[in-house]
């Protein structure tokens, strides 16, 4: 069974250590504060709105393989070249090297919300790494 760890639980560090020394994997809950969770929910709604745009609009922001950024149509990607194409569409973005021509302009605030989602994810990553740092007694300052 995969451990589910509430990061707001005062014993979360012990639960993480137990999970990763026994199972090697865990699912974290309550990882974000209320504001960040609300902001991420808004971003998920924004992404849903992007994928609901007409295909011709989404095609204005094509995936660029050399940068791994942009919009990929259904059946355009697959990790395993011997397998059928993935039946999904995606929009890959980045906060540091995303060219302006790949940011959709049809949705107000799309770029700002995308950048905010990266900031939230970065802070969450540091929070979780700091927890592992404390468990392992590395003494780092993240």
Regions found by a protein language model. Name each.
Residues 1-142:
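Peripheral, non-catalytic segments flanking oxidoreductase cores
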């Amino acid at each position: 069974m995969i451990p589910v760890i509430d990061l707001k639980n005062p014993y979360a560090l012990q639960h993480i250590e137990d999970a990763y020394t026994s199972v090697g994997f865990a699912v974290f809950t309550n990882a974000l504060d209320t504001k960040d969770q609300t902001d991420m929910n808004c971003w998920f709604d924004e992404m849903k709105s992007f994928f609901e745009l007409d295909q011709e609009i989404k095609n204005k922001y094509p995936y660029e393989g050399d940068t791994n950024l942009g919009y990929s149509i259904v059946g355009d990607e697959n990790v395993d070249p011997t397998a059928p194409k993935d039946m999904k569409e995606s929009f890959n973005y980045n906060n540091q090297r995303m060219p302006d021509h790949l940011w959709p302009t049809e949705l107000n605030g799309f770029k700002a919300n995308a950048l905010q989602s990266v900031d939230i994810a970065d802070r969450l990553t540091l929070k979780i790494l700091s927890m592992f740092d404390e468990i392992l007694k590395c003494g780092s300052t993240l």
